[in-house]
Amino acid sequence: MEKKLTLLLLVVVVLFVNLTNATVRVQICPRESAKDYILGFRDKSALHRPGFVTEGDDRWLQMAADMVDKKNKCDYAALLFYASWCPFSRLVRPSFDLMSLLYSSVPHFAIEESSVKASTLSKYGVHGFPTIILMNSTMLVVYRGSRTLDSLVAFYTDVTGIETMDERWVERNRLVPHFHAEPENCPFPWARRSPENLLRQETYLTLATVFVLLRLLHLISPTMVVFVKFTWGRVSNMRLGNPLEHTVTMYLKEPCMSSNLQEGAMNARAWASKSLATVSIAESSSSSRSVSASQ
């Protein structure tokens, strides 16, 4: 009988311990994998930490696209494309952080201009900085309004259909010093991108551009050589001078020489007229003599 009671007590203790462990296991969060630990969240569809904005690059953009895929629970993702050299980007970043508080169910990603390729910016329709985009599995919506809190909240609500938190909280945080009422943008920074970044980020595009430029130079080089030779010949002729052009120039520059030439021409004409008159008189006298002799 005592053995049965002992066995029964052991069974009760074992069952109690198992139930306690099961309860503890239910209350403890599951262990994160190494990938989840590195990425900073367990579920791709949940970035619910208030004010959490992920700094990303091309890989994070691909992850954001995967998060809003139809197979996942996340409906929308917010993207901020900014540039560190752009003052308007520094003004809009605090407002973007605040929007991640208001819409904590929407993952927010901040993408710096130098961390992505130019083709990626073109893909997302980024033509200036800063640019705020809301995207889902079927569309990208670019925000083009002012940067006041009311305007941003209206944009988020219209696109996502998600209502904000307490209106009184929004009212208290409406006048944030970093907000700017006008939608200024820094132009697309092609000139600001260093050749090193272009070569590293757009290797194929850079090599293709260099090839096209070299090919164009090869095609126009014969024409350029002919043009240079022709120009050099003209310059040499202008320096040495043509004898005929030199004579004409001297003739125009020296009036004495021109007057002497004019006098010589007049004397030649007078001499020629006198010679013709003498010849005509001689012929007339000889003809009159022959007529008288015949009579």
Curated annotation (Swiss-Prot):
Residues modified by glycosylation: 136
TM region positions: 208-228
Annotated protein name in UniProt: 5'-adenylylsulfate reductase-like 6
Positions of the Thioredoxin domain: 23-161
Primary localization class, coarse: membrane
Subcellular localization(s) per the UniProt record: Membrane
A Pfam entry, by short name: Thioredoxin
UniProt keyword Signal present: yes
Recorded GO CC terms: membrane
Secretion signal span: 1-22
InterPro entries cross-referenced by the UniProt entry: APRL4/6 (IPR044606), Thioredoxin-like_sf (IPR036249), Thioredoxin_domain (IPR013766)
Topology with respect to the bilayer: Single-pass membrane protein
SUPFAM superfamilies to which the protein is assigned, alphabetical: Thioredoxin-like
Source species taxonomy: Eukaryota, Viridiplantae, Streptophyta, Embryophyta, Tracheophyta
Keywords of this entry: Glycoprotein, Membrane, Signal, Transmembrane, Transmembrane helix
